[in-house]
């Protein structure tokens, strides 16, 4: 899945404009995907924990020179990659659970994006306060 995501990212000129090596570009994915998996394993109605990995990733991307638009695009590509992987493996999926899981996955990835954006905004606010 990481290789598929990276291939999509490398097709985006804006994202490629930030020169990062493999680890810098993909190192965050195992933790973000782990948070998605943890979320899928929660009982229905359980309060969703905030993704510390997403907050750290947002801060890192900001320091690496990403814009908000770039972070949103990277997150969108993660969702596309996850859903494409599910589509490729439809024969191995339990359809009765699939739709609720897709909703949970989308919600978790969006919640992670929210955490990233909060880091961007906090950094911008701190920068303004220092000015």
How should these model regions be labeled?
Residues 48-130:
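Long, amphipathic alpha-helical coupling/dimerization segments that relay conformational signals between
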Residues 1-69:
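N-terminal low-complexity or simple alpha-helical regulatory segments
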